[in-house]
Design a protein with these regions (language model features):
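Flexible hinge/capping segments at coil-to-helix
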Residues: 74-111, 115
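Short, well-ordered beta-strand segments
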Residues: 12-16, 64, 87, 111, ...
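Secondary-structure junction motif
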Residues: 94-95, 109-130, 197-201, 205-206
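Hydrophobic hinge/microswitch elements
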Residues: 48-53, 57-60, 67, 124-176
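Alpha-helical linker/hinge and terminal dimerization helices associated
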Residues: 1-6
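Short beta-strand->loop
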Residues: 75-85, 170-183
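A late-sequence structural motif
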Residues: 25, 174-213
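Central regulatory/effector-binding core of bacterial HTH transcription factors
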Residues: 10-72, 140
Length: 213
């Protein structure tokens, strides 16, 4: 069995995360870690929260990055908060000064992520609490397509605010004002409580905790 020091020279670190989380959050950490530990082989497995958590439980990944996991048996550390909002293309036929109700938002042609996305499930549950069922016109597997299709005027997209800042700053899309605020969530760094992390996983997590604040 490799010693802790040897693991930091020769080990492998497998991380599960969505493409969006990898590009938005993880990339600088991966770059720094690779520079500090060039002998460790980094493997990134792409998947939504449910998939990477399943892989964590099966031992296929060492660390999973998932949205507000509520499953038992996990050690979690919150990396950053996320907020669900609604946007439309800057030329879309709506009143960007109007403050929309939940029902008015639901009445738009909606562009949402597919149902297996945790953010979609959370959004639907929030609207159901108000007695409103969301029936999107378009369902997508890609977050980037939400912005692309909203930009060309196909409808109002439900997006994560933190992931669409560039499109908002460029003016391609605009926020719709609402009289409600959807509760925030977080992207968490997750490991199994009853499994000791490898030296590589411990070093990576320590770096994230130190530098993400």
């Amino acid at each position: 069995k490799l010693s802790q020091a040897q693991q930091l020279l020769l080990g492998t670190l497998t991380i599960g995360a969505s493409d969006t989380v990898t590009s938005f959050f993880l990339t600088p950490f991966l770059e720094t870690f690779h520079r500090q530990h060039p002998g460790i082989r980094l493997k990134i497995v792409s998947g939504r929260s449910a998939k990477v958590l399943s892989m964590l439980r099966s031992g296929a990944v060492d660390i999973a990055f998932a949205s507000s996991p509520s499953e038992p048996g996990l050690s979690t550390w919150s990396c950053f908060a996320t907020h669900s909002v609604f946007v439309a293309g800057s030329g879309y036929d709506c009143d960007f000064d109007h403050v929309y109700t939940r029902q008015e938002i639901a009445d738009f042609p909606l562009i949402l992520l597919e149902r297996k996305a945790s953010s979609r499930v959370f959004l639907e549950q929030y609207f159901l609490q108000g007695g409103i069922t969301l029936t999107p016109e378009i369902e997508l597997s890609s977050r980037s397509l939400l912005v692309s299709l909203a930009k060309i005027g196909l409808g109002v997209a439900g997006v994560t605010l933190e992931f669409v800042q560039d499109a908002l700053l460029s003016g391609d899309i605009r926020l719709l004002k609402t009289d409600f605020t959807i509760p925030s969530r977080s992207v968490d760094m997750c490991t199994l409580q009853d499994v000791s992390p490898t030296a590589a996983a411990s070093a990576f997590m320590e770096m994230v905790r130190r530098e993400a604040r």
